[in-house]
Amino acid sequence: IKSDKIKLKKGKPKTDINSSLKYISLTNKFYIIPDDSIEVFNQINISKAVSSNLQKPIIKNNHINKLTIKYGTKLKSNNIHISKIIISHLIKLNLEKHVYLTIIEKKIILIIFDKKELIFYNQFDLSNNNYVKYLILLFDEYKLDQKRDKIYYISSDISKKKVLNELRPYFFSIINHEKSIFDIITNECK
C-alpha cells in the first residue's frame, strides 16, 4: 500500500465487519501508562473519575516500548490508536530533544521526544489555529527556546503552507518531518 492510496473514512465501524481493514482510533480519551504502573492503574476505577470512554464494551491495550495505551472501543480486532502509530515511528529515530506536531482529521497531536524517550504526548480537537497557542504553552512549560529548539511538522491533509505561515511568527526552527502522517500510518500498519 502506498500512502497516496490511503483513504480516510469517518464513521463508526461495526464490530467484526470488514475484519481485513485496519481501523485507527483518534479518540482523545485515552491513557499512556508506563508498564511499571499498569497494575496500580488497573486497580483504580479511572473511568468513573476521569473518562466515561473507558466504559465502552472493549478496552484496548496497545503496547510500545514499556508503555501501554488504553482506550475504549466497540471493535474487537484490527484497531490501533494513533498514538501507538506515531510513538512507534518516532521511537525508532535516534533523537535529540525535539517537538513534533501533526494535524489529522481535526485532531492536533503534540509530542516531545528526547533520545527515544517519550516526554510529552497530547492530542485535542482543532479549533482555528489553537495549535499555535498550545505550542507556545508547551515551550514555556518545558523551558524550550522558541528561537533555538526545533519543531518537526509531520504533514497531513491540512495545507502545509498555512500551518508553517501560522507558526513562523512565533517559532524560528520549523522543519518538515521526512514522512507525512499517512506514510507513517502505512509503514507502521503493515
Q: What is each model feature region?
A:
Residues 1-190:
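Hydrophobic/aromatic-enriched cytosolic interaction surfaces used to assemble or bind macromolecules
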